[in-house]
A protein has these predicted regions:
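N-terminal segments that mediate ammonia production and transfer
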Residues: 1-243
């Protein structure tokens, strides 16, 4: 048997994260894509870290296309007028639990949106089931909201609009260190958190709604090796996932 080369010892290797994707190659949006992607991540427990009690995960998440059918329905209930498909962008926010700080952050974001020449449409509190979480995840759980921004008529759909949203996000990040923008785009949205693999589906009500339809879904289960788990550090990271 050959010995170790240098300082490398294969016995000290660690597992890394789990990743997966589901794509409808014809571009047809269905809820089946959401369900299949969630099923993938639920089968990646061997690629997902958790605490010693086995009740809090290192992080699990999913990236999806924005489902106009779904958001038109839920925004109508909130009296948020989002317009036609791809005529708006959505931000997913992890706000502080403290109400005063949260309201200050929201006001700051709305001010920056107006400063950049865009119109803010409204806020939606994301419905969640925090009772499925382990104590550690629940104790540091953020206040999760979605913010809606109208696409200006002089800005093209897709990448051009996303570039303007990117500038807004970067400016906001310089002004607020206590709020984390999970995603901000006119095309995609990220749902993630400090979950076990089976908690992503049950935590977010949005993911269980048959009207949430997408042609693309990417999932990630995190296995922390050199950084502590947190809500922010869960993947996907707005555009990509990686397994270390």
């Amino acid at each position: 048997m050959k010995g170790n080369k240098g300082l490398y010892c294969p016995m000290l290797e660690h597992d890394n994260c789990g990743i997966g994707a589901v794509v409808n190659i014809k571009g047809k949006k269905t809820h089946q894509v959401v369900s299949q992607a969630l099923e993938i991540v639920e089968n990646l427990e061997h690629r997902a870290g958790k605490d010693a009690e086995g009740k809090t995960g290192d992080g699990v998440g999913i990236l999806l296309q924005i489902s106009h059918r779904f958001f038109k329905k839920v925004c109508l209930k909130e009296q948020i007028l989002i317009g036609d498909d791809r005529e708006y962008g959505i931000g997913m926010f992890f706000f502080p639990a403290d109400e005063l700080t949260r309201n200050q952050s929201r006001k700051m974001f709305e001010t920056i949106v107006a400063k950049e020449g865009l119109r803010f449409l409204g806020w939606r509190k994301v419905p969640v089931h925090e009772d499925v979480l382990g104590k550690k995840a629940r104790d540091c759980m953020p206040y999760i909201m979605q913010g809606f921004i109208e696409k200006p008529s002089d800005t093209a759909k897709g990448l051009e609009f996303d570039r303007r949203l990117y500038a807004i996000r970067r400016e906001f990040e310089q002004s607020s260190t206590e709020t984390y923008i999970v995603s901000l785009s006119g095309r995609t949205i990220v749902y993630k958190g400090m979950f076990l693999v089976g908690q992503l589906r049950t935590f977010f009500e949005d993911l269980q709604d048959p009207d949430y339809q997408t042609a693309i879904a990417m999932v990630h289960s995190r296995f922390s090796t050199n950084t502590e788990p947190s809500w922010n550090r869960a993947h996907p990271n707005r555009f990509i996932v990686h397994n270390g």
